[in-house]
UniProtKB/Swiss-Prot annotation:
Family annotation (InterPro entries): ThiC, ThiC/Bza_core_dom, ThiC/BzaA/B
GO biological process: thiamine biosynthetic process; thiamine diphosphate biosynthetic process
Cofactor(s), by name: [4Fe-4S] cluster
A Pfam short name: ThiC_Rad_SAM
Protein name listed in UniProt: Phosphomethylpyrimidine synthase
Comment on bound cofactor: Binds 1 [4Fe-4S] cluster per subunit. The cluster is coordinated with 3 cysteines and an exchangeable S-adenosyl-L-methionine.
Protein's organism: Clostridium botulinum (strain Okra / Type B1)
Assigned EC number: 4.1.99.17
Phylogenetic classification of the source organism: Bacteria, Bacillati, Bacillota, Clostridia, Eubacteriales
Function (record text): Catalyzes the synthesis of the hydroxymethylpyrimidine phosphate (HMP-P) moiety of thiamine from aminoimidazole ribotide (AIR) in a radical S-adenosyl-L-methionine (SAM)-dependent reaction.
Length: 437
């Protein structure tokens, strides 16, 4: 193999098997895709050690992808349950899964996840550091943090979330500009705490070239984390968030010089009117790199319903440039999600992604909706169920409330507009009073 990474291959004019697969999925010319990869506009996260991967592309002109978060914690240390969640995410065709495990020895779960998953796998190495070394956070050295990142890359993680932009300059800006919610990024808060406790620079920022060595060696995509993402609408688009984004833009160029693919992570909580501007700022400051957003969550008052607040924001964000949506479940801000929460979160996020693809004019996006429209006009209920984003729920709702007329539902009965327009255009009587049809 005469290339190191997908980006290196693209710059050399080499079409990889991963590019061929992605181009076919996206209904696009593989040479056009290769150019986008070479410029960093599209990332194809594909670790050389992830043998079960079915690759996907993330970025300009492609379908909006979704990510599912899962992983073990101290209060919910159940590997079998998390593996059930992995299978649920795979069955529901999530393009990516992030292992956010943050307690104990996580390598066993991570290896099993990567071995079984065709989805892209992302991890956050700093979550693993305390358990990996059995050390307090402040006692972990800069080199040890990098060794954990390398272990995740060696295991086969396709992208690593590293909060490199939380450097001394960003930290100083944060201190000068108080927030209602401080830092709500788990990884960002851990790095900030380590920097404060040790009076040192961010080890990943200081050792960025070594981090790039790791990414280049395994062809790992670097997902530049947003330590200063807003945790409430009052903190959005503030000095800390923008200062960090400027740093991420500079780091992106350094990574591309080393042929390391980059994804930029983004907000967070913000009101509807700020979303489009934030998407444009990221694309400008980070040179068109793919944008990966959590939500955005558009109001802070809906615990138990944040899959809805997130889907609203995600649809708008993806319409205006976001390429990758992290799912949010009804359990957000409350507890670790269960399987039912996962399903609700995945469906809400997939709806947001698809709605944005329609608005962006992604090739082939309308085919699904047009097929549903035809099935509805034909009153072909079986086909409607097959096309539903949640077939099981659609079937159950109709079964629970059956109409006397086989063509209609219990909302309208024989006053169904679709039924009656079909009949009258075919020259048939409406037969409103008879029960025989």
């Amino acid at each position: 193999m005469n290339y190191t990474t997908q980006m290196d291959a693209a710059k050399k004019g080499i079409v990889t098997k991963e590019m061929e697969i992605v181009a076919k999925k996206e209904n696009m010319n593989v040479k056009d895709l290769m150019k986008l990869v070479s410029k960093g506009k599209v990332a194809i996260p594909a670790n050389k050690n992830h043998k079960s991967l079915d690759p996907e592309g993330i970025g300009q002109g492609l379908r909006t992808k979704i990510n599912v978060n899962l992983g073990i914690s101290k209060d919910c240390y159940n590997i079998d349950m998390e593996l059930e969640k992995v299978q649920k995410a795979i069955d529901m065709k999530a393009e990516a899964i992030m292992d956010l495990s943050c307690f104990g020895k996580t390598e066993e779960f991570r290896k099993r996840l990567i071995d079984m998953s065709p989805a892209i796998i992302g991890t956050v190495p700093i979550y693993d550091a305390v358990g990996f070394y059995d050390k307090e956070l402040k006692d972990i050295t800069s080199e040890e943090f990098l060794k954990v990142a390398e272990k995740h890359a060696e295991n086969g993680a396709d992208f690593l979330t590293i909060h490199v932009g939380m450097n001394r300059k960003t930290a100083a800006t944060f201190k000068k500009n108080p927030r209602r919610m401080n830092i709500v990024s788990r990884g960002g808060s851990l790095l900030y705490a380590w920097m404060e406790l040790n009076n040192k620079e961010n080890p990943f920022y200081e050792g960025f070239d070594k981090l790039l060595d790791i990414c280049e060696k395994y062809d790992v995509t670097l997902s530049l984390g947003d330590a200063c993402r807003p945790g409430c609408i009052e903190d959005s688009t503030d000095a800390s968030q923008i200062e960090e984004l400027i740093a991420l833009g500079e780091l992106t160029k350094r990574a591309w010089e080393r042929n390391v693919q980059v994804i930029i992570e983004g907000p967070g909580h913000m009101t509807l009117d700020e979303i489009e501007t934030n998407m444009k700022i990221e694309k400008k400051l980070c040179h068109g790199a793919p944008f990966y957003v959590l939500g955005p969550i558009v109001t802070d008052i809906a615990p138990g319903y944040d899959h809805i607040t997130s889907a609203i924001g995600g649809a708008i964000a993806a319409t205006h440039g976001a390429d990758f949506l992290c799912y949010v479940t009804p359990a957000e801000h409350l507890r670790l999600p269960n399987l039912d929460d996962m399903k609700e979160g995945i469906i809400a996020t997939k709806i947001a992604a698809h709605a944005a693809d329609l608005a962006k004019g992604v090739k082939g996006a309308r085919d699904w909706d047009n097929a549903m429209a035809k099935a509805r006009r034909d009153l072909d209920w079986e086909r409607m169920f097959e096309l539903s984003i949640d077939e099981e729920k659609a079937r159950r709702y109709r079964e629970e409330s059956k109409a006397k007329s086989k063509d209609s539902c219990t909302m309208c009965g024989k006053m169904c507009a679709v039924r009656n327009m079909n009949r009258v255009t075919e020259g048939k009587d409406l037969n409103m009073l008879r029960d025989d049809d």
